[in-house]
Amino acid sequence: MAENLKKLAQSESFLSLQDKVCFWANDYQTNSCDQNLNCCIELIEQVAKVQAQLFAILTATAQEGGHNEGVETIKSRLLPLLQTSFSSLGVGKIIQTEIRPIQDFQLRSKNRQSSLDQEQQQSDGDSFIESQPTQVQDDLTESGKNLEGTKNGSAISLLAAEEEINQLKKQLKSLQAQEDARHKTSENRRAEISRTDRRPSGKRNSERPQDVVSNYEKHLKNLKDEIAVLSAEKSGLQASHRQTRSRSPSPGPRGPRGPRGRRRSRSHSRSHSRSHSRSHSHSNSHSNSRSNSPCTTVAKIRSPSPNRSKMSSVARKAALLSRFSDAYSQARLDAQCLLRRCIDRAETVQRIIYIATVEAFHIAKMAFRHFKIRVRKMLTPSHVGSNDFETAVSDYIVCHLDLYDSQSSVNDVIRAMNVNPKISFPPEVDFCLLTDFIQEICCIAFAMQSLEPPLDIAFGADGEVFNEAKYRRSYDSDFTAPLVFYHVWPALMENDCVIMKGEAVTKRGAFWTTVRPVMRCRSRSLSPICPRSRFGISTVSRSRSPSPIRCTFARY
């Protein structure tokens, strides 16, 4: 191939091709048409000779490359050129003569590739056949291991079953021995009973009817007490109904205190009749009946229905939570309206209501403890040796929650508020304005102590870290302040879980700037009747004496 290439490089036709093209280009304008055509044909003939030599060199080069080399180059570059560039017959003959070796080379390469593929498939099949026995052997060993493990597991389970059978046999023997001993003891008891039956048993026969009669008498006494309570309730309701029907409306304009005084007179008559009937029916068990002062105001009196004990704890809890929520949303706002007529500062009003709520819970819990002690003393003689004594005490308390002396608790709360240094204000204002609110909170707190577990309010102190789990900030708070300035409403807790969130006011730096030395507060004497004007402002000056400084933290 190298010799042919050297001959082509030194051939006259290849060397004179460039010179002829240059001469033709220079003489093209002066030559005639025939002369130009002759020049062009001469160049084509010379180029054809060069191409024939190049194809010979191409064939030799492809043969030197072997079966696989140069195939892609010929396919991608030479074949498209041959299809588009040469259309004349003479050139076609030359191409056919030169292309045949290339086609033979392509055919040989295809045959070679197919033979290589067949050899590869055959080698793969031989390797699979060789690896199949080893795979079968591995499967056999694995199945043998599984069989051995199953055998060991079955042996272990068999041993466990045998051990369990032995234990059951031992238990059966012990039970048989116990049964034999029981039969022997029963036979001995029968023999003793038969011996004792021969003795006179008049005394024993006389004791049994006495026990039955005493039980019937206790049951009859309880029924009579319930009947007396219900009859007193009925008579009180009938009397109040007759009074309301006999009372005619006045033609003139009524004063602002008319409806409130009328409601208080009705509640006073009802409470008086109920307390009188209960003191009559429970004279043996209750030594002190409820006091009925002229200023007694009962916010919500619940009838002592016998079905009260049957009410589930969940239903009572839901009702009390609803009452507590109503007290926050309605009764608290009413109390604020009353106090705002006398006090300008909203902070002082909210502090007064919060302290009243805390004191009411504290006093109600103390009253519940004393009430439970009295119930225990009363029920002890009739439940001696019984296992359900605590259940009986709880049922009695739930059934007789209306025996709670709420007015006495209201008086105690007002006394505690009078000596609290945080809410000292001018003497023209009296805490008797909050009697209805305090009485409602006391009744709610007293009833919450009868739940299982009881509900209580969370401890709160000014300056404590704000807890989002217990309180929500009021609308006028600084939402970036970390400390509580003062509390608006306490949080309701069940053990350590928050049932209802309270409300607190947070202000950054306000707690330290408003701290002032604690002054001695002036105690307020509490009279049964609170003289007030239209808005609860006292028109009669009352004597006040200095009292010692008390701890300002909330009591629980």
Curated annotation (Swiss-Prot):
Entries under Pfam families matching the protein: MIEAP
Disulfide linkage: none
Biased composition, class Basic and acidic residues, residue ranges: 179-214
A single GO BP: positive regulation of cardiolipin metabolic process
Region feature Interaction with YWHAG/14-3-3 protein gamma, mapped onto this chain: 1-290
InterPro entries for the chain: MIEAP (IPR026169), MIEAP_C (IPR031981)
Region (Disordered): 110-150, 171-214, 234-313
Keyword tRNA-binding assigned: no
Regions of compositional bias (Basic residues) in chain numbering: 257-283
Stretches with biased composition (Polar residues): 129-138
Residue numbers carrying Phosphoserine: 13, 85, 123, 127, 154, 157, 303, 305, 527, 541
Subcellular location: Cytoplasm, Cytosol; Mitochondrion outer membrane; Mitochondrion matrix
Subunit record text: Interacts (via coiled-coil domains) with BNIP3L (via BH3 domain). Interacts (via coiled-coil domains) with BNIP3 (via BH3 domain). Interacts with YWHAG/14-3-3 protein gamma; a protein that also plays a role in MALM.
Family assignment from sequence similarity: Belongs to the MIEAP family.
The protein's name: Mitochondria-eating protein
